[in-house]
């Protein structure tokens, strides 16, 4: 479990993103969390030289649908990378496990099948507070990382 703020980066060691096109697929579920992660990702891409018109964002209903959204992006757009953004919070049932396992394996499968990398930015936390802490709270914004 991440317990330090890793949301700081050194732009001098990151390639300039000026000539790259990025896709972002973001889950609408827990949108207070996912929108903060998306904001962090977009601000970081812009800070690293990407232009706003080269950042394409799509929304899907939940984290489980991130795989579908990423696959559609891969098949319809020419992109250099895709960021999958979601948030799953542990509840009282096994639903958490099924969603987390499904989206993780789905993103792995897409990374193996396609040559465009998909970055996994899905918070899988035990509580809403942990998600808040990692989407702009005391542990930074994992969308930046």
Region annotations inferred by a language model:
Residues 1-21, 138-142:
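N-terminal presequence-like segments and the immediate start of the first folded domain
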Residues 96-97, 101-145:
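C-terminal binding/interaction regions
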Residues 29, 87-88, 123-127:
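Short, ordered loop/turn segments at secondary-structure junctions
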Residues 23, 56, 65, 80-82, ...:
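Structural motif
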Residues 13-18, 76, 110-114:
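Solvent-exposed alpha-helices and their adjacent loops that cap or buttress functional pockets
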Residues 12-60:
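Glycine-rich phosphate/diphosphate-binding loop of Rossmann-like nucleotide-binding domains
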Residues 65-107:
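Glycine-rich phosphate-binding loop
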Residues 40, 46-50, 54-77, 94, ...:
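Amphipathic alpha-helical hairpins
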């Amino acid at each position: 479990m991440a317990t330090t703020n890793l949301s700081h980066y050194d732009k001098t060691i990151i390639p300039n993103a000026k000539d790259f096109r990025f896709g972002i697929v973001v889950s609408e579920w827990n949108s207070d969390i996912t929108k903060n992660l998306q904001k962090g990702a977009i601000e970081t891409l812009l800070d690293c030289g990407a232009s706003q018109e080269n950042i394409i964002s799509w929304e899907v209903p939940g984290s489980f649908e991130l795989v579908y959204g990423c696959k559609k992006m891969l098949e319809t757009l020419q992109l250099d990378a895709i960021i999958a953004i979601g948030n799953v919070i542990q509840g009282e049932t096994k639903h958490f496990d099924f969603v987390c396992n499904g989206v993780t394996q789905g993103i792995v499968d897409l990374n193996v099948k396609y040559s465009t990398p998909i970055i996994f930015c899905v918070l899988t936390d035990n509580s809403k507070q942990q998600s808040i802490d990692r989407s702009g709270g005391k542990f930074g914004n994992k969308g930046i990382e």
